[in-house]
Amino acid sequence: MEKCSHESGRHSAENDGKYDITGSTATNVVDGFTMVAVGDVIVSRALANGHHPGFSEIVELLRAADVTFGNMETLIFDIRSFNGTPQAEYGGAYHVSLPEIGPDLKAMGFNIMGRANNHSLDWGVEGMRETSRILDESGIIHAGVGESRAQASAARLLETARGRVALLSCATSFTPMSRACDPAGEAPARPGVNALRLERSVVVEPDMLESLRKIRDALPNPGPKHDDREMLVLAGTTYRTGKDVGYTYAANTRDLADILRNVRRGKQYSDFCIFTNHAHEPGNWSEEPADFEQALARKLIDAGADAYVGHGPHRLRGIEIYKRRPIFYSLGNFFYDDLRTPVGADMYDVYDKDPQVDTDAEVTAAEETMGYPTAAGFIGALAEPVYYESVVAVSRFEENQLAELRLYPIELGYSKRLANRGVPSLAPRPQAISILERLQRLSEPFGTRITIEDRVGLIRL
């Protein structure tokens, strides 16, 4: 029975005895409904029959929930019969997984997965479509990509014994060529991801801006028709004056309006709504989310979402509870194995390797330790313990609101050899306490209090 929406003042049709003539967005799950949420799923081969000490305990957590979510950050296909190609624009590495991953993930307990991220089209539309086919055959609901923006942005529905779950998936971090669009006139739709475009500005002090203005004015190109004393554009980057030097982001208003409408639409057809966003901003180095993300997450919950699950930076970020709904700003990595093959010719070139001499594993090792190339050099190396530590988040709902959130610290075998690392197990006590204390510190600015009981983090409401 619907009890009460988390939207202020809105009650369900059953609660007030009136016929629902507007399409209620009230939450309507049976008491005890549980959601497991994890971060990035980057895994290349099936694990069910392998030797992975401690992983069975993780599987028990995944299987115990009504809905188990992860970010599907890889493509699934058999390279021997694959008709696509590695794309010139890719998400930093060419992620690829064997077809048996689909049924293996299902057997672990995953029943719903986000697809919108910066790797969604590493292997072109063909890789996107083949991954969709295999997930469909495996019985895993997925959202965030499609043959048009309308398809990519739509909610996908999962039936559970305690209520119907809607999933919507978007990415603020994506390759430009991967953004889906709808048809217009005679121009057909473009397949791809549900993208939320951001406009990034660099915030600088007033004297810094004046120095940049001198550089701009000295360059041999036409200046602006109207000069703004508090903002300028130099070499394609927007600079603005402000108190704190850093980055600021503004969401594209059309994209945001479309996303909010689709959340409302998805919730009208479901009992519980998960929204997930892939956001590397402001960078993998940052423990804090970018300045746009809190406002975005809250707007999505106001529109009907019951949980906001962030991922992208491969590391933990803080947790906020808003209107008795969880906001996970990043759940880090869940799987992070380094066994992807083939890696593609571009990766060999970037890391100065020779495919006739070096191996895919050696390219991957270089990528993890060096990061990815930029005009300023290599940045974003992930060969640090923090990227191999995370949590499994188990949310329990009573009376259609979050009642308890349990956080199980995991470690992904940072010190293991390349062929064996990246598979989660429950962290040993000292490491578990360290992970949870970090999460306490990261969540405190959002007013979230996490207690630690027997190496498990608890948020009780």
Swiss-Prot record:
Record-linked Pfam families: PGA_cap (PF09587)
Stored SUPFAM superfamilies: Metallo-dependent phosphatases
Keyword DNA damage: no
SMART domains: PGA_cap (SM00854)
Nucleus listed as a keyword: no
UniProt cross-references to InterPro entries, sorted A to Z: Capsule_synth_CapA, CW_Biosynth-Accessory, Metallo-depent_PP-like
UniProt keyword terms in alphabetical order: Plasmid
Biased composition (Basic and acidic residues): 1-19
Disordered: annotated span: 1-21
Similarity section: Belongs to the CapA family.
Function: Could be involved in the biosynthesis of a cell wall component.
Protein name (Swiss-Prot/TrEMBL): Uncharacterized protein y4uA
